[in-house]
Amino acid sequence: MRTIDKRIAPNVRLAATLVARAPALTLAYDARCKSRLAATLDTGEDVALVLPRGTVLRDGDVLVADDGALVRVAAAHEAVLLVRAPDALTLTRAAYHLGNRHTPVEVGAGCLKLEYDPALADMLTRLGATVERASAPFQPEAGAYGGGHRHGHDATFAEDYALAQQVFDEHHGHSHSHSHSHSHDHDHQHGPSCSHGHHHGHR
């Protein structure tokens, strides 16, 4: 069995014909978040995926097997919710509540897409949004500062915040004095109906 252990950086340009000839590895979003995976190429060949921990594959990524052969990643069709709203305010409110629950979301023109979840569908309907179940590829937003790893919401927030701070320091230097104190109280109850209470005090 061949092992796929490398991902070519997105900024590396490859000949289109070379990529087109590569066999596809079609995976749903949840599988694309796993760095260790037994998978099957579209050709029927079984392969082992062994990538650096924290890797999240995206549609169009190009991987390299241990024999040097290329494999291209394709996002599989899966059960999703398409969320639309009669006005921008309602759609923004829907996006806010999804973000508050740390739900992966793909943002489109006038539409939000997320993994199928009947509880979220009910919540969004109560907010005034129109929710449609569909089968489509799902490719949610990566972290705003490059953090796209799916470690759980606390790790993702910490990762993005650290990267944001790094970018700020690079642009503004390290000689600024900051007189901000932050108190964060998080009340997280994990389970089927995960509720999140966030209290942020800034002064």
From Swiss-Prot:
Alphabetically, the GO molecular function entries are: nickel cation binding; unfolded protein binding
Task: Give the similarity note.
Answer: Belongs to the UreE family.
Which biological processes are named by the entry's GO terms?
Answer: protein folding; protein-containing complex assembly; urea metabolic process
Task: Write down the species.
Answer: Burkholderia mallei (strain SAVP1)
- Its protein name is Urease accessory protein UreE
Q: What residue ranges are annotated as transmembrane?
A: none
Q: Which domain of life is it from?
A: Bacteria
- One GO location term (cellular component): cytoplasm
Q: Is Secreted one of the keywords UniProt gives this record? A: no
Q: Cite the CDD domains for this sequence.
A: UreE
Q: Which NCBIfam families does the annotation name?
A: PRK13261.1-1, PRK13263.1
Keywords (A to Z) from UniProt: Chaperone, Cytoplasm, Nickel, Nickel insertion
**SMART domains in alphabetical order:** UreE_N (SM00988)
Which SUPFAM superfamilies does this UniProt record tie to the protein? Answer: Urease metallochaperone UreE, C-terminal domain, Urease metallochaperone UreE, N-terminal domain
Region Disordered: list its residue ranges. 170-203
InterPro entries per record? UreE (IPR012406), UreE_C_dom (IPR007864), UreE_N (IPR004029), UreE_N_sf (IPR036118)
Compartments, as annotated in UniProt: Cytoplasm
What this protein is reported to do is described as: Involved in urease metallocenter assembly. Binds nickel. Probably functions as a nickel donor during metallocenter assembly.
